[in-house]
């Protein structure tokens, strides 16, 4: 099995059930988790993906390298808390640049017990996913870089998988609630708009 060369000080490790190991830089929560591994090719919407109920029990590999650069905006959550088990990215998240953001990706993951891992060859990892289906993995984040590789591989092999699980029960809200949020609006209001001369009614509806 091929093993990615270790960076100077790896603080995160991803172990596949077949023994393949990926090293990287951890962010978010510390600790270990086992899950199913999948990938997503979207260029935007990482927050929506992490909170999408359909990703429950899965570690998501993002093939687009710029993840985290728009921070976290509470209004963009698909559910109250992220349901994905963790995330794998090419480059470590940088400081966000988004006037709507209220939090950075790393602290947001940490406060919700989710592990992130950067510095990974996500193309190679995605090829492994395509070849193996949805491999079982163990993901670990330790600031000291102290990993028991054999134990992580065994943890990945011991993961029972998602087949047959009632995941809807885990991601559904505990009780009904009222939806009180309105359509988002610019807090300072909008300047008057002048419709172009000769513009169609359809164009005015869209403007």
State where each predicted segment sits:
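RNA-binding accessory domains that recognize and position tRNA/RNA substrates
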Residues: 3-207
